[in-house]
Each structure stands twice: as structure tokens, then as C-alpha cells.
């Protein structure tokens, strides 16, 4: 199994992403339920334009973040660190992503918040179940690397 496939399978089983934005020297983090799109290597999240992180993001901004479980032992630690770009989706792109998001999280139908895409450009996946400190790396537009 290649690196991106292994990472994608794990991300598909999780549901909360943390991402951080920086604007004019100020940092802010946010958490949200996400839908992972393995084909585009992106998360889709819903968040209101009035939130601090959305206002700091504007239409598009660089981001970094994490997805992790809550294991009880070090030997079971698995998690992703990433960097990429967040942007507010519009039009048909937004409609398609919202439809997919609502299939996974039907309760979100009552939320009028816009859809945002977090495009992942670099991923580091730590998976201690494969051996302590096992890391897999993926970069957009390049072949996967293992460390």
C-alpha cells in the first residue's frame, strides 16, 4: 500500500481536524468535523464567516494543523500533521462539497455555514502501531517519502 493510501484510509476513519491560521502576526486555531476527500487530498469543513478563524483566513490563507486520536498508550499513537491552504468554496464547487459533507454528517443540514476546503500540500503521518516513531511523509506533486 502506498503512503497516500495509508494516510487516506486513516483520515477517513477520523472526523475532527484542528487547523491554525496566521494573519498580521496573530495566530488562531479552530476545530471542526471534516469530510476527507482522498482524490483531492483535502478536508471539507463548515464554518461561519463571522468566526475569528474565518475572518483571519479571508478568501484564502495558508494553514497548518493536525488530526489525531486519543490513544491510552504511546504504542498506539497515530496522527497527522499537515500544512496547506484554506479557501472558502463558492458556486458549484461548494454545492458538490456540501452534498458530500451532509451525507457524512446529516445533522449539519441545519447549519447555513459556508463550506471551506483545506487543501493538504504536505502531510506527516506518525503511526506507532507500525513501530515506535514510524513516520510517513507525502508532498503534493511529488512522490511519497518514508522516514
UniProtKB/Swiss-Prot annotation:
SUPFAM superfamilies: FMN-binding split barrel. It comes from the Bacteria. Disulfide bonds: none annotated. InterPro entries: Split_barrel_FMN-bd (IPR012349), UPF0306 (IPR011194). Belongs to the UPF0306 family. HAMAP family: UPF0306. This is UPF0306 protein YhbP. The gene is yhbP.
